[in-house]
Regions:
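Anionic-ligand binding patches
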Residues: 49-197
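N-terminal polybasic phosphate/anion-binding patch
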Residues: 2-77
Length: 197
């Protein structure tokens, strides 16, 4: 049985569990006879602690994956996939009103090509958005204070607090990972679509 190594740019439990859970869904399609090993590493995103734009979220996820590619080259590792995960805020103006959404993004690379995926978004309360965007408080600290708990980011995350645990941080990243891996586990369709252009 082949062993496929998937390097993840985080050591946080919800992120690693999200990748593992996503693999349970698409792994048999990606590599039918393979065993998967998820490896977590602390790598820098190159963006702020709480990204506040879609561009910053996407850049952070991609830069984490690219850091893993470089790490594999330096260590002479034969990892097959590199996963960068980034959570944060996306601000949208609609009819002059600001709406701030919590989103989770993934970027998956095989070392040559990469693809993005994201979760849905949940609108955060205006007071929480103000605390993070105007006062510069990191989201993990602000959500702990708003919820009256400690260590939320390593548990259900802001997603869980905002959705009464109907959607957790792990759930959101799982969706982002499923979406980012789609061009790999559904490569036939993606190649056909590219050829039809």
């Amino acid at each position: 049985m082949d062993k496929i190594h998937i390097a993840v740019g985080s050591t946080r439990r919800p992120k690693l569990a999200a990748v593992t859970q996503a693999l349970e869904s698409f792994g048999p399609v990606l590599e039918p006879a393979a065993e998967f090993a998820v490896l977590g590493f602390d790598v820098e995103s190159g963006v702020s602690h709480t990204p506040s734009t879609r561009d910053e979220l996407m850049r952070g996820a991609r830069q984490r994956a690219e850091s893993l590619v470089r790490l594999a080259q330096q260590r002479h590792e034969a990892w097959q996939y590199f996963v960068g995960l980034e959570g944060g805020l996306d601000t949208v103006q609609v009819d002059g009103a600001r709406h701030v959404f919590l989103e989770s993004w993934a970027y998956v690379s095989d070392g040559s090509v990469g693809h993005y995926g994201r979760s849905g978004g949940v609108e955060i309360p205006a007071a929480l958005a103000h605390e993070v965007l105007e006062n510069g408080v990191e989201l993990s600290q602000a959500i702990d204070r708003f919820a009256g708990e400690v260590g939320i980011r390593d548990a259900q995350g802001a997603w869980g607090v905002l959705s009464r645990n109907l959607i957790t941080r792990q759930d959101a990243f799982r969706v982002a990972v499923l979406a980012a891996f789609a061009p790999f586990y559904n490569s036939k369709m993606y190649r056909a679509a590219s050829a039809a252009r």
